[in-house]
Amino acid sequence: PVEFSTSSWRRAVLSLEEHHKAWLLWCYSGSICWEYQIAITQWAWNEFNTQSVTRKIAGKTQERLKKLIWLAAQAVKAELFGGEGYEYQELALLAGVTTKNWSKTFTRHWVAMKHIFHRLDSEAL
């Protein structure tokens, strides 16, 4: 049966670190488990903060960035499957900032967030 032939893969995935397991199950198996989404975003946010420790980020900007971390995960998943990500104008609207402010302040953070998820994908696989 198919369950038997795939059991070694399931065991391998389930033995991974929590954020790797959560990413693979959410991204590739289509699981919408809330706990996986939380594990992915918490891990990515911690990674983002670790990378950003050398630069001071204003509190209001920080709050807006928190709201974007899950969108970055969704954008990377879409890209991995040949879909399109978000346009910067859309992201500016979602973040509640002007496109000029997005370009000046948020673009580099958005790129860093997406890079974190691309790295997570590579490491998990």
Task: Label every model-predicted segment.
Residues 1-52, 56-61, 80-125:
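N-terminal interaction/assembly modules
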Residues 14-21, 66-74:
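Short helix-coil-helix linker/hinge
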